[in-house]
């Protein structure tokens, strides 16, 4: 199941991790940094930068950014380097990346049950992938900072009233009132606080044995009874237990290391005031580090080679993700990669593809071939969620006649399967998946082992923005991917 690694987190309550940046490196690093050609944490301000809030009070914004700059960082450069090493392994097929979490976190969602449920499903999915794929798995949570969302329109109109669009709790509130929708820079500090609390709680859970495979009550596989693959699913879980017992018999003691796992955080680097305020230099390490997260990514709407987001992220030392969709031009993508990674650094660039099951075959092969021909090392990850979003109108049930966004489980799985095949044919690796999920029993995506229908969506539809896989669907997806990887 790969070499277990201890989890490391940082929050204001665990400042000992900040000393990693002071003590773990005995001499300055001589590696070239990415902060070249006139880059600074604020150089993005000279570029056209999309999807930024229209802050009403510049003084309040300056005060909030100053507060952020004084607060302890959320992650360390040591952890970021560790992730980059693991991403480099994924690029060559030695490792698989599991990135998942909420579409958009909310401040109210920072509560123990919700956090524990998300951690639980990611841990269980990763164990299934390790067992089925026979590869080490890196777990990256899409949380502890995923509080901002891009919008297709700056404004929203209801019943003749027009207000700013809801851009996530980092910017404004969801309620349709002038007070709630006004962009409030004080929310930037609240976002940092919620992220720190989330990291602190996750660390305490893992330290306390939450990831311990010796506790069968953490595994809820009731849903497999609804699937024709039930026997295969149960056998996979049994094999994990058998492997653990074999290791313990072999060494004669309990394998304590499996109580702790490595875990990283990620979010879309959208609001650059927030990112800039937490970008710092650290002792004994070269370059600038975005210490708000281990792994930021650039969305499709902001992936402009000459735009502010690419300008900002080209100068930090973190690995950087880039969302790639049907509108992505191969030449523009190569320009983005060249700007973000002039040194062709393994583990630096992660391309997260989001086409939809209906479009992936028409778009992904030519992009894969273009990047492969360039010789640049990248990690390819499949996001099977965003390209498969659709709006349906249930014909019966609680939500009868009301349009609702959803995703079909069959389409999600089909996009992943096509991605595997396209990379196999091209001689490249699918290095991971990027999914929106929750560990709770929501009804937002249709299909899966229970056969959720459009008419059942209103029973438990709680997403703030886009539909997510529920616990059962997420674990079923992991098992089906593991089955595909084992072929």
Q: Where are the regions a protein language model picked out?
A:
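Short, positively charged low-complexity motifs
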Residues: 3-8
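A residue-identity detector for tryptophan
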Residues: 18, 39, 44, 55, ...
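Glycine-rich, charged/polar anion/phosphate-binding loops
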Residues: 82-84, 306-309, 336, 365-367
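Non-transmembrane, aqueous-exposed alpha-helical and coiled segments at domain scale
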Residues: 340-342, 348-379, 386-442
